[in-house]
Structure formats: C-alpha cells, structure tokens
Amino acid sequence: MDLTTTRQRRPLISDSSSSSSTKSYSKTDKPGRSNGGDAEDGGLRWFLPFIALCYLRYMSATSNIIHDCDEVFNYWEPLHYILYKSGFQTWEYSSNFALRSYLYILFHELAGRPASWWFGDDKVRVFYAVRLFLGLVSAVSDTVLVVALSRKYGKRIATYAVAMLCLTSGCFFASTSFLPSSFSMYAISLSSGLLLFEKYAMAVAVSVVGVILGWPFSILAFLPVVIYSLVKRFKQAFIAGAVTTIFLLGVSLLVDYYYYKRWTSSVLNLLIYNVLGGGESHLYGTEGALFYIRNGFNNFNFCFILAMLFVAIYPVIRRKYDRALLVVISPMYIWLAFMSLQPHKEERFLYPIYPLICVSASAVIENIPELFREKYSSRESLLVTITKYMRPVILGCILCASHSRTFALINGYSAPLEVYKLLEHHDDAGPGSVLCVGSEWHRYPSSFFVPHYISEVRWIDDGFRGLLPFPFNNTLGGTSASPPYFNNKNQASEEQYLKNIETCTFLIELQLSRPYQYRGSDLSTWEAIAVLPYLDRELSPAKYRSFFIPHMWQEKNVFGKYVALRRVPK
C-alpha cells in the first residue's frame, strides 16, 4: 500500500513580515492600565501600603505639633468637656449661634471614651489615643486610594503616591489633626479610590459624609467625583447620595437638639452664616492671593510644583490614563483657585486636596520620559533613558526636603506640648491650683494636658483685644448655654481676663529677645520648673528656619525660651 506523506512547508521570513502590521510600534502605543489592569499581579497588594501608612501615621500621632488654636478650642476642648465635664467653649458653640456640629465631636468620642475608661486620669494618653485613631482612619482611606491607583494605572504611580502620602510634610501633619478639613481629606482619598474602583455609589456616599460630617465648605472639592459618578451610574449613585444625605442631616439635627437644647442644624447655620449671613471672616486675618502657593511649596516643596504641571502635560499623556484620573485630580485646581480668592486664608483650609497633590505629582514624575520620547520612533533616545533614571532621584529629593521640613517644625515648635506635660510632676502644689496664660493663649495645647489638681486655667491680659474662649458654664446649662459674654464680632469681653494675678499658682510664658520685661523675670515671685527652646520666627531667617539642615539650623536660627513658672511660696 502506498503511503502518502504530506510535508508542511516551513514558514518563510517573508510570510511573517507580510502578515505583521506595517505601522511602527513604540511604547507610547501600549494600552493604558485603565484598559483592564495588570493581569499578572493585579497591582499592589493591600498589606504593604497599609503598613507603611500606619507606621508614618503613628509617627505623626506621637510627634505632631498643634498648628492652629482653632483645633484646640473648637474641637479638642468640646471633646474634653464631653469626656470630663470641663473645658473651654468658643462663641461658635454658644446655643445662640450653634455653628459647630457635635456629631463631628461624637465621632471622635468613639476613640476618646474607651481611652478615658482605660487610662483613667491620664488625660495625655487619651489625647494621643484619639490622634492614633485619626491616623488609622487616614491610613485606611489613603490605602484604598493607593491600591486603586496601582490596579488601574500601574505599580509605579502608586508607589510614588504612597511614598509622598507617607512623607510629605503636609500629609504628615494634616493626617492626625483634629479638624473637619482633615476629615474631608480622608473622605477625598476614600471617595477618589472608590471611583477608580468603579464603586460609584459608595464614592458618592463617602463624599456626602465628608461634607456633612466633616467640612460643609468642602462640597466644591467633591463635585467632580459626584458628577462623574452620577454620569456613570446615575440611579445607584443618586440613591446612595440622597439616602446618606437624609440620614446624616437627620442624625445631625437630633444630636444638635440634644446638646443645644433647641431645634437647629449646625451644618445649615454654618453655611448661612458664611454664605448668606455675611460672616466676617476677615476679622480673623487676611492674606494675599499667593498665600496658598507659598504654603503649598512649604508643605510639599517640588511635589507641589510638579502637581501643578499635570494639566499642562495631560494632552501628552492622555493615551496612558483614562478620564477618571483627570476627574480625581481636578478638585486640586478647583479648590486652590476658589480658596485663593477668599480674603481669609488658613493653612488648614487646603487640607482636603493634600492627597490629590501627591497623586498629581506621582503621575507627572512617572511620565517625565514621555515628554522626551519621539512620537514615531521605536528606538529609545538617550534623553528618555536618562529621564527614566531621574525619576527616583526626583522622588528622593522631594522626600528628603519633606523630611527636613517636618523635622524643622517638630524641633522648632513642639515646646508647648512638652512643657505642659511636665505640669503633672508638680501635684504637690495641691488641689485648687490656678494655671495662668497670657499672650500664649493661642498655643494652649488643650485641657487634656492640664492635670486634675489644677482647678482653673485663666487668661491674663497681655494686650490682646479679641474674644477669648470661656469655660463651659454648667450653671447656665453647659452646651445649651447662651452666655451674654459671647459675640460674633471678635470683640473682647470684660470678663475674659483674670483681674488678680496674685491668685496664679503657675504661669506659662514664651520669653523672646524683646525690649520689655516678662513676668517670669521677677525671680522673687516666680521660679522656672520647665524650660524648652522655641524657634523665634521673627528673628530667624526664612531660608534657615523652614528646612532642617544639621548644625546650620541650630547655628543660624534664634531661639526663645518656652517656660512654665511656679509661684515662689512666701
């Protein structure tokens, strides 16, 4: 029988060349990660970013200074009152005005109440327990954002982002600050991450929480995420937003009634006062249009500059990223422009967009080589190769400058917290002791640092003519009181200062090189029980005080003395 074998022809080179596309290929033609993600590794795992963020948030919680007296008097003090039935009240918490939400304070009681049971009279530990709680919330929200970035756009942009979220000075300090703007920052991170995960209903719900429970004015920063989510999944996103809004406004209304003892909404009161009621924020200081640009550079150095460039290079890199990343980053520009137009400016007002600055800068750093790539060439130029290796160098410079800035602030301005901690070692003064504070009232670190043997903290007149906080008046009703000495014009009350300084047992002073005498200079009346250096901002050159450079920082700057004094027994 004849066997017929069929031999298959070996493919020729010309066959393969003819079947392939004639169009040249370059790396810029690769589909972006937004078209399906990395099938091999699925992006970063949850564990490592979370651990890194938790570690840095722990460091922030334990070493962060208090940057603003508003944090103390409008948030730490009401929490102290809820926990211990003593603390200072500002005019915003007067029942007559009711501008502050107790629901936001109660959220922090979730950590403060168990800590007060566990640590008893050690209120300083309760303070740091609340800070650790804030750090944990920040770490969780930032982890969601980082993992979402990695799964949608790749590990590199996510790695850059987590490094800057951990170490940039702005994020380091804002992450554990007890402020509504910090809470809105957590919500911005979480809602942005959920949007990238395509969890649109959850993104809208978190946005509502950030606005109502956190800072109502931050609604402008959440608009891009909310609008994009509604476009993508209108029904689910709308229902989630509506239900969350109704629920939180209802709960807030009930909580406000419980504490203010009248039907009122602190959320609406705050908006009406500032938007419709002619809120006179200029009474508390005004700044120029470039304030936030300078502030952004101080807190993020070159990261801030790179972040601002994202919109400029987006036309070059838009094939790599889908529209979702532009939506996530856009609140940075909207918020910065809007806040720069307001006369009253505070550093904390920029907190909500801090994570977006890191994301934007990460995208720019990742794509620096793309700016130098030849469009139709498949070969990589020397300049592209060099810029690839420059990316970690740029990131390293940002992180080193950030660490230097963080270290400068902690070493320069941590004295108030540390000096007040030492008061607990002088309980031999006995119950009923009075702690007096003059011009340093705005650096008062909160009643959590005042030992139980001190019965009163009193302000003494050092020339300040604005309205100071008063202790919550339990006789008039505590949180429901409308004391007559409060006003919304920042006008000093005759009752706010202690008349007889002879009743002071302890005195807190900042002694700087100025041509006048300090009360603590009278050594026959006062003895120093704690003295720590404090950076003299006015006499220290900006180029040396802003960033910590070993040896030079100590030599070129001028320091005063932050002093706790005790009355000499007669």
From Swiss-Prot:
Q: Which terms does the UniProt entry file under GO BP? A: dolichol-linked oligosaccharide biosynthetic process
- Annotated stretches, region: Disordered: 1-37
Q: What is its main location?
A: endoplasmic reticulum
**Which stretches does UniProt call biased (Low complexity)?**
14-25
Instruction: List the Pfam families hit by this protein, alphabetically.
Output: Glyco_transf_22
Residues annotated as transmembrane: 129-149, 160-180, 208-228, 237-257, 297-317, 324-344, 349-369, 381-401
User: One GO cellular component from the entry?
Assistant: endoplasmic reticulum membrane
Membrane topology of the entry:
Multi-pass membrane protein
Top-level class of the enzyme under EC nomenclature: transferase
Q: What does this protein do?
A: Mannosyltransferase that operates in the biosynthetic pathway of dolichol-linked oligosaccharides, the glycan precursors employed in protein asparagine (N)-glycosylation. The assembly of dolichol-linked oligosaccharides begins on the cytosolic side of the endoplasmic reticulum membrane and finishes in its lumen. The sequential addition of sugars to dolichol pyrophosphate produces dolichol-linked oligosaccharides containing fourteen sugars, including two GlcNAcs, nine mannoses and three glucoses.
| Miscellaneous section | In the absence of ALG9 activity, the N-glycans transferred to proteins are aberrant, indicating that the oligosaccharyltransferase (OST) complex is substrate-tolerant.
Q: Tell me the protein's name.
A: Alpha-1,2-mannosyltransferase ALG9
